[in-house]
């Protein structure tokens, strides 16, 4: 097989599929983040009843992102989506300090789930465009993220509204998917 045919084969190779679970409390900005990733209009977003799925191409991967509603009544159903998850993205509203304890509890429970064991987790500290937003370092400390030892994790400041920090987070996702998939 010549070099040219090898290159053709590589070029035609389909992108590797990655299953990403996008979770967080209601109003954290999950759907806005997903639409930002898909370069879609973010001016009219309503609370997610159930789930949204979008596929996004990034760095040779086809990222299949499952955005699951975060309302309290929907959260018990999150576990129905855990199977075969490659990466967990957890979104936090950095400006809603009254809910830090609640979001921390939900994240802690997710990290205890057997079907999510060893799954890398990216925590987006969202809404950094708001003056009242807590910095990612303060959130990381408050959630005791430094105690996570059984998986790769990253906290990333972002604004789903402006797009700032979103690509940095997705670069981390792609890097950790390639490490996991090898």
UniProtKB/Swiss-Prot annotation:
GO terms for biological process: cilium assembly; Golgi to plasma membrane transport; kidney development; mitotic cytokinesis; photoreceptor cell development; protein localization to ciliary membrane; protein transport; small GTPase-mediated signal transduction. Its main location: Golgi. InterPro entries: ARL2/3 (IPR044612), P-loop_NTPase (IPR027417), Small_GTP-bd (IPR005225), Small_GTPase_ARF/SAR (IPR006689). Belongs to the small GTPase superfamily. Arf family. Keywords: Cell cycle, Cell division, Cell projection, Cytoplasm, Cytoskeleton, Golgi apparatus, GTP-binding, Lipoprotein, Magnesium, Membrane, Metal-binding, Myristate, Nucleotide-binding, Nucleus, Phosphoprotein, Protein transport, Transport. This is ADP-ribosylation factor-like protein 3. It comes from the Eukaryota. The keyword Oxidoreductase does not apply. Mg(2+) binds at residues 31, 48. GTP binds at residues 24-31, 48, 67-71, 126-129, 159-161. Small GTP-binding protein which cycles between an inactive GDP-bound and an active GTP-bound form, and the rate of cycling is regulated by guanine nucleotide exchange factors (GEF) and GTPase-activating proteins (GAP). Required for normal cytokinesis and cilia signaling. Requires assistance from GTPase-activating proteins (GAPs) like RP2 and PDE6D, in order to cycle between inactive GDP-bound and active GTP-bound forms. Required for targeting proteins to the cilium, including myristoylated NPHP3 and prenylated INPP5E. A lipid is attached at residue 2 (N-myristoyl glycine). One of its GO terms (molecular function) is metal ion binding. PROSITE patterns: ARF (PS51417).
């Amino acid at each position: 097989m010549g070099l040219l045919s090898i290159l053709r084969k590589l070029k035609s190779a389909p992108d590797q599929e990655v299953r990403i679970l996008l979770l967080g409390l209601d109003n954290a900005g999950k759907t806005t983040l997903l639409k930002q990733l898909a370069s879609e209009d973010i001016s009219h977003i309503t609370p997610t009843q159930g789930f949204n799925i979008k596929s996004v191409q990034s760095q040779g991967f086809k990222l299949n992102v499952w955005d699951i509603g975060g309302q309290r009544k929907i959260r018990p159903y999150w576990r129905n989506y855990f199977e075969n998850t490659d990466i967990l993205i957890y979104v936090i509203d950095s400006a809603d300090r009254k809910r830090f304890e609640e979001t921390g509890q939900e994240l802690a429970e997710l990290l205890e789930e057997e079907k999510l064991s060893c799954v890398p987790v990216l925590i987006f500290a969202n809404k950094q465009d708001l003056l009242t937003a807590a910095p990612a370092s303060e959130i990381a400390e408050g959630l005791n993220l430094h105690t996570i030892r059984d998986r790769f994790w990253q906290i990333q400041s972002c604004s789903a509204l402006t797009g700032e920090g979103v690509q940095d987070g997705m670069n981390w996702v792609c890097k950790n998917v390639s490490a996991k998939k090898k």
